[in-house]
Swiss-Prot record:
PANTHER family: DNA-DIRECTED RNA POLYMERASE I SUBUNIT 2 (PTHR20856)
Entry EC no(s): 2.7.7.6
Species the sequence originates in: Leifsonia xyli subsp. xyli (strain CTCB07)
NCBIfam families to which the protein is assigned, alphabetical: PRK00405.1, rpoB
Pfam families: RNA_pol_Rpb2_1, RNA_pol_Rpb2_2, RNA_pol_Rpb2_3, RNA_pol_Rpb2_45, RNA_pol_Rpb2_6, RNA_pol_Rpb2_7
UniProt protein name: DNA-directed RNA polymerase subunit beta
Subunit and partners: The RNAP catalytic core consists of 2 alpha, 1 beta, 1 beta' and 1 omega subunit. When a sigma factor is associated with the core the holoenzyme is formed, which can initiate transcription.
Keywords: DNA-directed RNA polymerase, Nucleotidyltransferase, Transcription, Transferase
Catalytic activity, as annotated: RNA(n) + a ribonucleoside 5'-triphosphate = RNA(n+1) + diphosphate
EC category name: transferase
Length: 1165
């Protein structure tokens, strides 16, 4: 895909997709192109399975002499870790080597079509060795199906596309903290050694200057006892920690002399009440920190400990050493003594290392667990379960007959992988609303999930923006609501290193000269340098122009620094933001809260009938669309030899022929239409990486989420009060904002206790009109228009056989036919849905569709498409967090119009801008107007001094790019407004103020004040009124209270809450209130009688007693209060009598309310 990172026409003009170039207002030339935006997912998975792409990267790294890539793949690491599995007597062992994947079973399309998982069988070579005889048996063992990642970074599990989100977790390593003591004014210092798996080790210096240790979060004990247990004598401890008073004080209080005593003392405190054996005591400590099976620092933990403590232990040392523990205690007591640095090793050289307490929210201490590692951890869990089974079988099976195959049970491994993909918090149903939604989902970083934080426990500090996020995680794009700050998005240029830390690129600066060398730095490495921003002015040779340059230092502090002190410089102004945020033009003029909404709302944009890329873009549109993978791209250069709506064939230059198959009107996960549209013609010459066909919401290989509409900022009769939006009828008529939505409905024919369900056209008591569109199988035909209640698939379910009368028995005997006792359980179009049938799939168990599940004989899936025009109540938004609901659609003749007669498309309220501080939208409409009309600058005006040569003139409808933090300036926009190309009449409708005279469409009179008019990019969001509007006549009732259910999904009613009751009480509307609280709600007898009266055309009777009153009485009786209901003459009334009457009345009407199920609905008449 990186091949599609099209060449640039010149430094400033970005060429995206096919023949689309954007005229850029950028002042800075990017030294680095945007990297592959899916690398976070694909590279991690490549490492896990060790495929060809991974092998190529390892070879390239070796050729460059780099050692940063691990040699072993993820699966190799895990099988190596578990090998060998030995029995208790160590007489035999089983080991695994060389895991490999065979050819995949089904293609991606087959998996989606038939609801299967896109996977390949995993095999491993298993070797069984009998130590007694020296016999070795080797077999290749099948370890289950292993899900594969598609090229687009997704997984297909049971036919649905899913994404595994990367997790942000605390890195293993050693951490030092200081906390103020509540009673004294001393700082209490503590240290924690946190492994990847295993027990924590904690040290603490208390207010009495005693050094304590906590093993596995248990009771605190003296650190000198712990050191003695590790084999040090008192003399060695004093020599090692000479000059540290706190250790001397601790040693004075310590009466234990020998290693054995120390071990026993620790054992007593960890396992109180147990008998202490010297061997058990030694084994306990060994198992905690020195046994690789129980304790693992992982490479990253070892790297962090080496770096923090100035050690040089090899990265393969995954357990603690005595040296680590001594170094940790030394660091801690040095901090306590107020020292600022100590001498340690870095890269084999002795250097001074700063003594610091750690900030847990710093990105040097938080790392990413990407897909590969998450799956690896899950396989590890499965293998450790399998290990137990293998050990059991080793002891029970006959040693002569054992082979690797008989020992291994792959079920735990398969179950662990299935569990992860099916139910883990980090394996998510992919957001396919539009290409950007999918791309952002794959680049998401989550602090939640197993081993991470929980929403409830996460404080403000974890959620806050940290200086170390710069260039690594976007400070803007995060959800609103309870997850704010816990879920983020990877910054545009960031990448993950082999330890899982996020790196960001910088240009190296040597003595004030900015070189083209690009180094990727982690947050910890960056702390050692002073970094200048990307727009620091440089001269022609690359030196800083100013003597003192604005730069940031450790901790994010910004200051003016002498040029020669600068170590690095940003590669691009958009380095700090994510892809979603970098698509917002004039981001620098928007308040951060609104920019957050803008970035999030772009992901909710619905793909429209005809996509249109923004006139005012940022230059990121092409990168986003191509890397999202929804655009079909030519793999090789060649000539297009054949084109149809669903396939394009290219004759490549090397003689091969490639056919690209396109997806037509598929349903996305979110129910939007996924459709490819060919952009090449037969006979065209096409280069590798160019666009063959556009996907949803893309135009010519550029992201196209909305439409460029003519917007006026003005009030209009109060109809655009409070962010409401007024639209022109033209947008409805021309289908400008229409979108296609596809719903999927399925029905299963199962085996029931009373017989098989059957899909058929022969339905009991159904009129022929309703069957008109069903074929002979009872399935609706493609192309049929359906409305709510129409039958999609005819299905009958057997009823219980009743005793037959003599006549029926005679008829059966004569005609030899069962007068079938079946009920109609057909699939019908739900309430509020309608559309056209565009597809039907039939799966039959007899045809070997084994994925149907037990007891299912047939499954029919029906797809209904509907075209939704824009309508009042739909939600629209711009890219700056400016959102609103359509309140009125005006006839085009009533819309305000420009002096040349052009009516505006949208009227927005100007009061929505100043309070929200998203001024970028105003600059966008001005630049949109300039780009739509074209311009020509004569001479060299002062305001155009920084404009690139190519931007001095442009034809109408030129697409422009204004990159974030480096876009068009206000004075440039004002100047360009004065030099836009005039209309046919020679008029220039808008001047440098950006405002123009508008005329009232109804009267033709000019409005008193000039109005800001221009082109804004407007998105239609997935909050459509058709999905929300809902009405109920009769429907299901709650089982206990007998009140109607709530919500559209349950076909519920509207709640008349206590505030509404107060309103009617205030008006004294007693009868209306009584009706609402009884017969329209939970007066069972009353509502049945009202229904009867309406059916028969009689007067409605008095309401009865509501069910909730009976529930209240039962509640009080359960609290031992004897509550009775008395009639007017003082007689006790049994509420049961009223119930009996209700059942009798219901029976007469043929309504079954005896079961009082959740769906005891009047529909059952």
């Amino acid at each position: 895909m990186a091949a599609a990172r099209n060449a640039t026409n010149n430094d400033k003009t970005l060429k995206n997709g096919r023949d689309v170039s954007r005229l850029s207002f950028a002042k800075i030339t990017d030294t680095l192109t945007v990297p592959d935006l899916l690398a976070l997912q694909t590279e991690s998975f490549d490492w896990l399975v060790g495929n060809d792409a991974w092998q190529a990267r390892v070879a390239a790294a070796e050729a460059q002499g780099r050692q940063d890539l691990p040699a072993a793949t993820g699966l190799e690491e895990i099988f190596e870790e578990i090998s060998p599995i030995e029995d208790l007597g160590e007489t035999m062992q089983l080991s695994f080597t060389n895991p490999f994947l065979e050819e995949k079973k089904y293609s991606i399309d087959e998996c989606k079509e038939k609801g299967r998982t896109y996977a390949a069988p995993l095999y491993v070579e298993a070797e069984f060795m009998n130590h007694l005889t020296g016999e070795i048996k080797t077999q290749t063992v099948f370890m289950g199906d292993f899900p594969l990642m598609t090229e687009r970074g997704t997984f297909i599990i049971n036919g649905t596309e899913r994404v595994v989100v990367s997790q942000l977790v605390r890195s293993p390593g050693v951490y030092f903290e200081a906390a103020a003591d509540k009673t004294s004014d001393k700082d209490i210092y503590s240290a924690r050694v946190i492994p990847s798996r295993g027990s924590w080790l904690e040290f603490e210096i208390d207010k009495r200057d005693q050094v304590g240790v906590r093993i596995d979060r248990k009771r605190k004990q003296s650190v000198t006892v712990f050191l003695k247990a590790l084999g040090l004598t008192s003399e060695e401890i004093l020599a090692e920690f000479a000059g540290f008073q706190s250790i001397e004080l601790t040693l004075e209080k310590d009466a234990i002399l020998t290693k054995e005593e120390a071990l026993k003392d620790i054992y007593r405190k960890l396992r109180p009440g147990e008998q202490v054996a010297a061997e058990a005591a030694r084994a306990l400590l060994d198992n905690f920190y020195f046994n690789p099976k129980r304790y693992d620092l992982a490479k990253v933990g070892r790297y962090k400990i080496n770096r923090k403590l100035g050690l040089e232990a090899p990265l393969t040392d995954s357990v603690l050493t005595v040296q680590d523990i001594i170094a940790t205690i030394k660091y801690l007591v040095s901090l306590h003594d107020g020292q600022t640095s100590f001498t340690g090793l870095r890269s084999g050289v002795e250097t001074d290392i700063r003594l610091d307490i750690d900030d847990i929210d710093h990105f040097g201490n938080r790392r990413i667990r990407a897909v590969g590692e998450l799956i690896q951890n899950q396989v590890r869990t499965g293998l450790s379960r399998m290990e137990r089974v293998v050990r059991e079988r080793m002891t029970t099976q006959d040693i002569e007959a054992i082979t690797p195959q008989t020992l291994i049970n792959v079920r735990p491994v398969v179950a662990a992988i299935k569990e992860f993909f099916g139910t883990s918090q980090l394996s998510q149903f992919m957001d396919q609303n539009n290409p950007l939604a999918g791309l952002t989902h794959k680049r998401r970083l989550s602090a939640l999930g197993p081993g991470g934080l929980s929403r409830e426990r996460a404080g403000v500090e974890v959620r806050d923006v940290h200086p170390s996020h710069y260039g690594r995680m976007c400070p803007i794009e995060t959800p609103e609501g309870p997850n704010i700050g816990l879920i983020g998005s990877l910054a545009s240029f960031a990448r993950i290193n082999s330890f899982g830390f996020i790196e960001t690129p910088y240009r190296k600066v040597v003595d004030g000269l900015v070189t083209d060398q690009i180094d990727y730095l982690t947050a910890s490495e960056e702390d050692d340098f002073v970094v200048a921003q990307a727009n620091a002015p440089l001269d022609a040779r690359g030196h800083f122009v100013e003597e003192r340059v604005l730069a940031r230092q450790k901790g994010g502090e910004v200051d003016l620094v002498p040029a020669e002190e600068i170590g690095y410089m940003d590669v691009s102004p958009r380095q700090m933001v994510s892809v979603g945020t970098s698509l917002i033009p004039f981001l620098e003029h928007d308040d951060a809260n609104r920019a957050l909404m803008g970035a999030n709302m772009q992901r909710q944009a619905v793909p429209l009938l005809r996509s249109e890329s923004p006139v005012v873009g940022t230059g990121m549109e092409g990168y986003a669309a191509i890397d999202a993978g929804d655009v079909v791209i030519a793999e090789k250069s060649g000539i297009v030899s054949e084109v149809s709506a669903d396939a394009v064939t290219v004759q490549a230059d090397d003689g091969t022929v490639k056919t690209y198959y396109l997806r037509k009107f598929d349903r996305s996960n979110q129910g939007t239409s996924y459709n490819h549209r060919v952009v090449v013609d037969e006979g065209d010459r096409i280069e590798a990486g160019e666009v063959v066909a556009d996907g949803p919401a893309t135009e010519n290989g550029e992201l196209a989420l909305g439409k460029n509409l003519l917007v006026a900022f003005m009030p209009w009769e109060g109809h655009n009060f409070e962010d409401a939006i007024i639209l022109s009828q033209n947008l409805v008529k021309d289908d400008t904002l229409s979108s296609i939505h596809i719903e999927e409905y399925e029905v299963d024919a199962r085996d029931t206790k009373l017989g098989k369900e059957e899909i058929t056209r022969d339905l009991p008591n159904v009129s022929p009109d309703l069957l008109a569109d069903l074929d002979e199988r009872g399935i609706i035909r493609i192309g049929a228009e359906v409305r709510p209640g129409d039958i999609l698939v005819g299905k009958v379910t057997p009823k219980g056989e009743t005793e037959l009368s003599a006549e029926e028995r005679l008829l059966r005997a004569i005609f030899n036919e069962k007068s079938r006792e079946v009920r109609d359980t057909s699939l019908k179009v739900p309430h509020g849905e309608e559309g056209t049938i565009i597809g039907v799939k039939v799966f039959d168990a007899q045809d070997g569709d084994d994925e149907l599940g037990s007891g299912v004989n047939q499954r029919v899936v029906v797809y209904i498409a509907q075209k939704r025009k824009i309508t009042a109540g739909d939600k629209l938004a711009g890219r700056h967090g400016n959102k609103g609901v359509i309140s009125k659609i005006l006839p085009v003749e009533d819309m305000p119009f420009l002096a040349d007669g052009t009516p505006v498309d949208v009227i927005l309220n100007p009061l929505g801008v100043p309070g929200r501080m998203n001024f970028g939208q105003v600059l966008e409409i001005h630049l949109g107007w300039i780009a739509k009309n074209g311009w020509e600058i004569k001479g060299k005006p002062k305001w155009a001094a920084e404009l690139p040569e190519t931007a001095f003139s442009a034809a109408p409808n030129t697409k422009v790019a204004t990159p974030v933090f480096d876009g068009a300036k206000e004075e440039e926009i004002a100047g360009l407004l004065d030099v836009t190309l005039p209309t046919r009449d020679g008029d220039r409708l808008i001047g440098s103020s950006g405002k123009t005279q508008l005329f009232d469409g109804r009267s033709g009179e000019p409005y008193p004040d000039p109005v800001s008019v221009g082109y804004m990019y407007i998105l239609k969001l997935h909050h459509l009124v058709d999905d929300k509007i809902h009405a109920r006549s009769t429907g299901p009732y709650s089982m206990i209270t007998q009140q109607p259910l709530g919500g559209k999904a349950q076909f519920g009613g509207q709640r008349f809450g206590e505030m509404e009751v107060w309103a009617l009480e205030a008006y004294g509307a007693a009868y209306a209130l009584q009706e609402l609280l009884t017969i329209k709600s939970d007066d069972i007898l009353g509502r049945v009688k009202v229904y009867e009266a309406i059916v028969k055309g009689e007067n409605i009777q008095e309401p009865g007693i509501p069910e909730s009153f009976k529930v209240l009485i039962k509640e009080m009786q359960s609290l031992c209060l004897n509550v009775e209901v008395l009639s007017a003459d003082g007689q006790a009334v049994s509420l049961r009598d009223a119930d009996d009457e209700a059942f009798r009345a219901a029976e007469e009407l043929g309504i079954n309310i005896s079961s009082r199920f959740e769906s005891s609905s009047i529909d059952e008449i």
